[in-house]
Amino acid sequence: YFLGYTLITTSAVFWLSHVNMRSAAWLSSFVFIAALLTGATQSAAALIYVGLFFAGVGAGMLYGISITIIGQSDAPDKHFGIALAAQLVLGSALLFAGPAIIGPQFGFAGILIACAFFVAILSVTTQWTPTSISAENQQGGDKTSTGHGATVFVSLIALLCWFTGYSGVYAFVERIGVAGGLTGQQIGLILSLTIITGVAGAMGAAWLGDRWGAMKPHWLGMAGTLVTIGLLSNEPSLLQYSLAIIALTLTLNFWLAYMLGSVTRVDISGRYAVLTTAALGGGAMVGPAMSGFVLQQTDMLQVLLISLILIFAGFSGITMALRRFSAMPVTSH
């Protein structure tokens, strides 16, 4: 799934700006639905994998189009926060119904069919997708292109490092709870609340918007991350683990809105914003694999340390990109 997701969004930088976005969104919805149904109706493992690959293609393209549209809005940080909150709220329905209701009765195929039905319902909103996006919406003039490519590249690498680090932590939060002596029921109850705290973090970003400027939210996110890693260290107790998960989901969803907003802020062409989806997909693949490898060689503390280093690298990279962008000369129309 993530392979198809990452490949399509990486290639989109070459062609997305040249196609009708509404038509591309309709096509992506169709591919997404057809791929999910293919995976649900096939018994051969190879065909199921092919279905999931193309499901990733459809989902990645839809997400890339959404990122591009939001990135060119007048308040991307705010709108990314709203979008992330909507993802969590809508996704929570399937996240609950899949393993609790649909899976036990209809199996994996039933879950895929339910996902296809869900995508079909949401695809109705595609009719409001703009056909194209103009990147020339800067107020007071446009930044010159000098150094633009390097700044965007730095911001994308920063996002990749950042999400790799966070994915590496998130993939093993259950094991951290078990190491602290918590029961599966306790861990499940705590993790079930992450939808609420995640939405709160995303809506916090939507409410704050750009009131604190471009830099301060990143410092706040880094502070929240340090608190999270500190709480997850040393086999946390029930209270400590609960606070850590609250801090993790609040910080992740709050900060993600600003990470995405910052990349689109420095991408004055509007062409490269779609690569944020590739960076997120890459991080989602590499992070858990990296943490699993490190855990086999050492212990969970080293996993947390390496993840923290990657998150800090992302923080350093995105703030450097923002400083470079703010220092670029402006040309008036």
Each language-model region and where it sits:
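Helix-to-loop junctions at the C-terminal end of transmembrane segments
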Residues: 7-21, 201-214, 295-296
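Structural signature of the two symmetry-related core transmembrane helices
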Residues: 23-37, 216-231, 308
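Hydrophobic core of transmembrane alpha-helices in multi-pass small-molecule transporters
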Residues: 47-61, 160, 240-254
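A late C-terminal transmembrane helix in Major Facilitator Superfamily
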Residues: 266-300, 307
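Intracellular juxtamembrane helix-capping segments at the cytosolic ends
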Residues: 60-74, 253-267
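Extracytoplasmic gate region of multi-pass secondary transporters
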Residues: 150-192, 196-200
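C-terminal membrane-cytosol helix-exit motif in multi-pass small-molecule transporters
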Residues: 95-106, 110-138, 317-322
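C-terminal transmembrane helical hairpin of 12-TM major facilitator-type secondary transporters
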Residues: 209-259
